[in-house]
Amino acid sequence: MSHQEFKVVVSGAGAAGIGAARRLRDAGVATLLVEARPRLGGRAWTVPGPAGPMDIGCGWLHSADRNPWAPIAEAQGLTVDRTPPPWGRASSLVGLGARDGAEFGAALQNFRREVDAAAEAATDRAADSLLRPGDHWNHLIDAVSTWYSGVELDRVSVRDLARYDDSGVNWRVVEGYGTAIAKHAAGADVQLDCVVQRIDRRGRQLRLETTCGVITADAAIVTLPSNVLAETPELFLPALPDKTEAASGLPLGLANKLYLSLSGADEFEKESRAFGASDRTRTGVYHFRPFGRPMIEAFFGGDLAAELEKGGKEAFFDFAVAEFVSLFGGDFARRVKPLRAHGWRGDPFARGSYSCALPGRADCRAVLAAPVENRLFFAGEACSATDFSTAHGAYETGLAAADRAIAAVRASAPG
């Protein structure tokens, strides 16, 4: 087995890891960025499509007016599209009348006010306890939770949900969010197809045992998803039970996408959307003609996404077609064809989509983010106090971890 030595090793080449590696490189610190996959980006992944790039992972630059990926993408020569998202325009909603759309919007806003108020209480609780008993819109509000948090409201901490900081401005990268994030690794020393199996702290240096050999370092930054950390306690030697427990309180919810081609696309308004149903939680949300392209981006979350993932692309497609037929009639089935889907739960290096604190576990984010021995640092969206579940939240925790690592290795340098 080979042996390599660096000042800092960064484990995981998603938004957090790439951000950390770039910061360390710019500071002149010898750094290796290690990634288990054969590609960069982590849960940010853009793939080619017949009508244009498709973001299989994150696609929206949330809080875009303060999202660092917007200026990064533009500096790369990519195009940031500032068209407002379909969920921000009532006129973009297909299949739900103006009156019903307004009623649902009001119900959702009322629920969010209840969340903010309840978060001030001394005791945390599950968000489903704030739904108005018998309200017609409860199922759809719960469905929104599966897209927003990746889980139904009974598994969402009110306190954590209220802490999420969203400016309400949402943009996209025409060439793909995943493209921008992967490009930001340019110039970094990267080892792909390299799984970190153990991080041993028993010596003067850290010893990382990987599938591509042993790596020693003065410090390491771990950016692995919370589900991976929760399910592989053997990663750390000696064990870090506080980290394992914190990660288990921040499980990754599930949101999966299916892209479909659409014939006769001009019948739909650009950037419009439709709910598959308004009277049940197990439904998809469909984005028609993103960027004006002749396609549909279908989004499934929570328990529904987990069930469909077991059946692969065909199951996602069959479910979507059934909802389309109920909305637009039987002839619509002939107008769509599946292009690409990905199941994030079955992805061994993700095991889900984005983190959501369980009721009573909101403070786990700070525990997960805390350094160990001033040489083992943690980053990733689950470590963000207010921007969790986003690529910019992950990136900013990566920068913070890198700054701590830079200070640590400089403080330990002789002379």
Language model feature labels by segment:
Residues 1-415:
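FAD-dinucleotide binding site
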